[in-house]
Amino acid sequence: MGEWFSKAGLAQFACSETQKFGHVTYFWNGNRSGKFAGETWQEVPSDVVPFEQRPWMKAAEITDAMIAALRSGQYKTLRCNFANGDMVGHTGNFRAATMSVEAVDLQLARILPVIDAVGGVALITADHGNADEMYEIDKKTGAAAQNKDGSYKAKTAHTLNPVPLILYDNVSGGRLGLRQTEKAGLSNIAATVANLLGLEKHAAWDESLLDIR
């Protein structure tokens, strides 16, 4: 997407903390280490402590950067990655994972009104689950698995649950929506973003999920 949007002359902003910075830059750009023309990258240094001790991580600082970039009016498309649910989910600490997701909720409540104010829309999604399932499930009973001492067995791996794709839109008057399908995946995201930006999709991309009413 970064290259396609750059060729279209769009200014882009990418931000995350160290733990996920590569996901919005290097991986996003097809394992390319350098920027495309028109890209601005901002890395927020992560705390060097166990994640369960700082479950809020750098969500607030990422949000500060995103709000400043939105208000600057310089960028046509912006992207960020909140690492909380994944990194804290890996610890198996249920209380910390709950706090990590709540921290992201708080920051979305800051970002979304600014998106409204600048006349934008947002897509919110993930590439896998983690904090959504913090205990191992007993395959025979379907209940949470327990250790010998009666405590629940922590799940520290990614889950296989489907993830949502949410279109946040308060500017189109209800004209924008997403097609409902069980076959969609991450491969549809690029065309959906291009569609929102008024661009043609790359020929290699899967179809857009945008439904314009």
What are these model-derived regions, one by one?
Residues 1-213:
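Feature captures the catalytic ectodomains and active-site-proximal regions of enzymes
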